């Protein structure tokens, strides 16, 4: 499947490169273009929105932004970092309110919304700069309209619209050092002009990584992602609009690497706690440089994110009725090697299954310019299962009473190419953390704007939520117990 998708991407790219080159038009006169946003779940000028909003539009295609985290250079008070151990996971901070996900029991305080679908976990939110029309950064609490736990703000991501009038192929190829190869394609096909249109998109992102693993003899910390899907838009008349969006993202990227900075001759490498170096990074050559690592782990990931969004809009003279159905299914498998050495000391395996389903129905008034409101109901369900294995050799040694960890025994026969011999256990598995959770939530919300004058607007809003979480979990220690 991946080979077929990449072949189609390359074909679309070649097709685009063979299009006739059009003469460059003269530069247009300088004008201030109105920016329309949907920060309050309705289209309005960004100048009329009574909140702190940054909209990033044309800058996306013209900038060096590769992934969502790069937009922090364009939006004040926004910081986005990658979360180790979480596939395409994000640690987002807005105005000092941070959202760092340790597990998925609670929704993040910084919400991410894609085409009206609230992403209830930070996994898979670091999208590449591909098929995105606009990103809105909403600062401050957004609980009235977006609900959940959005006390810090929202990243509102809007995909490019489906064209009903023009056939187009937009493709790009980026190559670079360290095996970088990005292929992206968006194809627009009007099936029935002004009535029915289809958009097909696909992207392949590959990069070997900037760090070289001398133990595994290959580069580490690279990207390997495939994102593809389609959007179908049907507008049978001027009032009714139906849009179906479906996409799949496969992420097999390595979740970064832990570099051990100890080298032979330094103090940390002259101390042996239990008869061997506490980490075998001490065996690396001091001249290897800061871009090398000697680790037995690959920090691999094998994650799939499948999303479906169905949106219906019915536009009348006085009201706009909107219904949004969304479903997101995630299957994550990640491994993290925390010691950064060739010794198998501390690592974790993460297995997560997540499925969310939501229904939203809302009404937006259009009968008055002085008085406007949005009211709706929101239903949300999540099924989540977690299974984490912790492999901790230090823990096992402490249970055995070995060396500095116990009664002073000497541990021998352990090196970078072999496991400990002669000890009475079969695995360094120390503990297992398993849990399941089911969440059911329903909410009713409304937001009212009363435009008293051109300079003064009175805004009021409320949200009532009833939520139930059923949780079952525990932690079990395993291994050798003397």
Where are these regions (language model features)?
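Residue-level signature of outer-membrane beta-barrel architecture
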Residues: 114-116, 175, 189-191, 232-235, ...
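Transmembrane beta-barrel architecture of outer-membrane proteins
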Residues: 63, 89, 109, 152, ...
